[in-house]
């Protein structure tokens, strides 16, 4: 009571001087607070080690300070009075004095409480006598709150989101991010766009240390301690900086031998005496051996072997057991034979038996049995007992064994591809007109095979050569035969000079090449041609013996002069093909039997011949001149070689992958080549692209004899032994990045078949989209 009243009087006395002393009291309070906090932080000055027990601190100041302690013993200082608070307390006490008895009762209650606290705290006698005691009281726990609400332990973390350890991206499509302890949705915080994030990155200085909590979606700012911890972990150091990594080693068990052993008990007497139990066991075993009761291991094995008897095993494993494949990983089983069909029956239905045509085709593929649909010819018997022994049984078994152990096996994934997807999307033929569609005229007059045909450069006349040893000149518009020139041998090839200023036809008959003036067309042109071929020019160069023995130039005799023959070039072997250069001064001939002199080049103006090759690269079948460049195309049976006539070197070798080449035709621009083969194929070569075929066309059923490009229109035609002439669209673009467009247009099949031969030669009209074809039926047909 006295202490409380003294405090009140002191407050009243200090009222007039509050403003004057405020600054001095504030400085003194700050010094006292720092001293008290330093005393709290220093563990050596703690009055007790027990947590949760009220502790007392002493101070010389008359002001009262209270400290609150948490469960871990950390204290927080709280000032109880200041200059402003003292004014408020003094004013409150004056009001209380005016109230009277009510204030006195409250004072008495406060004295009782202070006495009870003093009796519980029990401060030290020496400190309490000299200084005023300052008590630090622990706050009482509210019974209405949970016991572990304010806990700081890691096991009781304040986790508001109760979804558990799940991927949080499951809540990306929802407005909430989980549920709290009351099963209420935790709404996601507002998310800014990229502009907001950019502004925060610029304006917020703590943006670099801000992370997002995936459980709550809130931005959490990392403290300096967290950043220091992260740096230590990243650098590979121990996270706790207070941990001493290199503490002094304490040898709990020393390596030095001590003088006094821990255990020094002397050995027992039985440790060095023979064991009595072992002695008894050995004596029993000796007695059993003497009596024959006990047997050795070898005797036991011999008795077991006698009981088992002889052991039999199979030389090979059974078919049901899986063979252990050594040295082979992931073995592939052999493919099974196809089950027999109705055609293999001894009495098959009539529709499975071959007719005369099918039998002929089956026998025709004798050299290529793998192309047959059936490897046998179905037969019909009345009964099973009439079926003879199968003569090819051993051969088929032998081939099957060869396939099983010689052919490599591999697993392939079967692709289910729609057939329509593989068919290229081609334009409609109606959009690609004009092209020949019907047969317009038939030129009849030859009595044997018509092997070759050629058209005048202006497109008015037509020349043909036949096996009936005649050369006929036709008028295209009327179909009238204007002139017939008889020869001594079969006419293999005819070629009209492409130069419109000359009227010359080259005729290959036997060993001779005849240069004929057809005497049709302009008379001035005919006379100019006769003047050119009348006299031989002087020879400036001496020809070698190799050329003289291969070819000889001479003027035609009188009887041949009347027929129109002007010059005769005699070769040492039969001529198969003749072709002109684009300018009309050079022409080349092919003699397949001539070995390294199979191809010859003749110059008309100088009446001189050349042998371009000194070595034989194979049997030459066909030659061509490039329409623009000084290049020479030479086709052997399997390959095509392109030579530069100026540099006299090989430029390129085209690989046809065919058995036998029959003919060639080059595009007017000179960048694409069309090749026909006897194995039913046509090959399109893009000379700028590759040495392999750009496209292989199998449009015919039999051997393809001839192919030809049109000079003006994007058309080409092919003739085959299946009596068909197929007209196709072949557009070559100026853009090198765009591939040629090839579209089959029309199949013209009007020729008749004679002795397995059909169409022998095709040629285009130089101006109109018309095509001429010669056949084994001794006719020439025009399609327009």
Swiss-Prot record:
Extent of Basic residues compositional bias: 1-11
Localisation: Nucleus, Nucleolus; Nucleus, Nucleoplasm
Compositional bias per record (Acidic residues), positions renumbered to this chain: 27-36, 45-54, 62-73, 84-111, 149-158
UniProt superkingdom: Eukaryota
Biased composition (Basic and acidic residues): 112-123, 138-148
Summary of the function given for this chain in its UniProt record: Required for maturation of ribosomal RNAs and formation of the large ribosomal subunit.
Protein name per UniProt: Ribosome biogenesis protein BOP1 homolog
């Amino acid at each position: 009571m006295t202490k409380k009243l003294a405090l009140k009087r002191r407050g009243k006395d200090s009222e007039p001087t509050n403003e004057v002393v405020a600054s001095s009291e504030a400085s003194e309070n700050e010094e006292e607070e720092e001293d008290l906090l330093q005393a709290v932080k220093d563990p050596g000055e703690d009055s007790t080690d027990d947590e949760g027990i009220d502790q007392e601190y002493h101070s010389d100041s008359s002001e009262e300070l209270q400290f609150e302690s948490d469960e871990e013993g950390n204290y927080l200082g709280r000032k109880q009075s200041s200059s402003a608070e003292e004014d408020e307390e003094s004013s409150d006490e004056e009001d209380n004095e005016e109230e009277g008895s009510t204030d006195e009762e409250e004072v008495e209650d406060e004295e009782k409480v202070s006495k009870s606290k003093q009796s519980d705290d029990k401060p030290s006698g020496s400190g309490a006598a000299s200084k005023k005691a300052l008590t630090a009281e622990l706050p009482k726990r509210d019974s209405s709150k949970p016991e572990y609400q304010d806990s700081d332990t890691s096991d009781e973390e304040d986790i508001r989101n109760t979804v558990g350890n799940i991927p949080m991206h499951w809540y990306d499509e929802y407005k909430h991010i989980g549920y709290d302890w009351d099963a209420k949705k935790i709404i996601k915080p507002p998310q800014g766009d990229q502009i907001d994030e950019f502004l925060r990155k610029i304006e917020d200085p703590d943006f670099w240390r801000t992370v997002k909590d995936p459980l709550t979606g809130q931005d959490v700012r990392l403290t300096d301690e967290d950043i220091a911890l992260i740096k230590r972990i990243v650098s590979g150091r121990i996270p706790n900086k207070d941990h001493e990594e290199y503490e002094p080693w304490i040898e709990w068990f020393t390596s030095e031998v001590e003088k006094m052993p821990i255990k020094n008990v002397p050995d027992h007497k039985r440790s060095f005496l023979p064991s009595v139990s072992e002695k008894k066991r050995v004596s029993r075993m000796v007695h059993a051996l003497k009596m024959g009761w006990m047997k050795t291991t070898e005797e036991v094995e011999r008795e077991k072997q006698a009981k088992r008897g002889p052991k039999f095993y199979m030389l090979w494993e059974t078919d049901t057991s899986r063979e252990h494949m050594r040295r082979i990983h992931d073995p592939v089983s052999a493919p099974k034979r196809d089950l027999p069909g109705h055609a293999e029956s001894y009495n098959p239905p009539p529709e499975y038996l071959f007719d005369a045509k099918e039998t002929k085709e089956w026998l025709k593929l004798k050299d290529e049995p793998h192309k047959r649909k059936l490897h046998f010819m179905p037969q019909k018997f009345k009964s099973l007992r009439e079926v003879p022994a199968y003569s090819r049984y051993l051969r088929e078994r032998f081939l099957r064994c060869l396939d099983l152990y010689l052919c490599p096996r591999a697993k392939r994934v079967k692709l289910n591809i729609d057939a329509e997807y593989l068919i290229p999307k081609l334009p409609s033929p109606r959009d690609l007109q004009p092209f020949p569609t019907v047969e317009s005229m038939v030129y009849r007059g030859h009595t044997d095979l018509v092997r070759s045909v050629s058209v005048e450069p202006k497109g008015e006349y037509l020349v043909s050569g036949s096996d009936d040893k005649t050369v006929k000149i036709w008028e295209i518009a009327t179909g009238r035969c204007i002139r017939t020139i008889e020869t001594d041998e079969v006419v293999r090839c005819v070629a009209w000079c492409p130069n419109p200023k000359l009227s010359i036809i080259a005729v290959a008959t036997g060993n001779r090449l005849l240069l004929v003036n057809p005497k049709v067309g302009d008379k001035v042109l005919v006379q100019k041609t006769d003047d050119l071929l009348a006299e031989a020019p002087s020879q400036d160069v001496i020809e070698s013996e190799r050329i003289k023995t291969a070819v000889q130039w001479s003027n035609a005799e009188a009887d041949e002069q009347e027929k129109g023959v002007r010059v005769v070039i005699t070769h040492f072997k039969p001529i198969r093909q003749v072709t002109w250069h684009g300018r009309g001064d050079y022409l080349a001939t092919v003699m397949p039997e001539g070995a390294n002199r199979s191809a010859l080049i003749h110059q008309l103006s100088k009446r001189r011949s050349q042998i371009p090759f000194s070595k034989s690269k194979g049997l030459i079948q066909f030659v061509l001149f490039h329409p623009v460049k000084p290049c020479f195309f030479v086709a052997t049976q399997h390959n095509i070689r392109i030579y530069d006539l100026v540099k006299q070197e090989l430029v390129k070798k085209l690989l046809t992958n065919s058995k036998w080449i029959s003919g060639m035709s080059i595009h007017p621009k000179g960048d694409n080549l069309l090749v026909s083969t006897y194995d039913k194929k046509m090959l399109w070569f893009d000379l700028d692209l590759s040495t392999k075929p750009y496209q292989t066309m199998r449009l015919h059923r039999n051997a393809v004899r001839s192919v030809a490009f049109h000079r003006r229109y994007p058309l080409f035609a092919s003739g085959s032994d299946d009596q068909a002439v197929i007209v196709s669209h072949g557009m070559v673009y100026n853009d090198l990045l765009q591939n040629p467009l090839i579209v089959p247009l029309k199949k013209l099949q009007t020729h008749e078949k004679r002795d397995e031969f059909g169409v022998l030669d095709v040629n285009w009209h130089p101006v109109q989209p018309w095509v001429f074809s010669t056949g084994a039926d001794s006719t020439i047909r025009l399609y327009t």
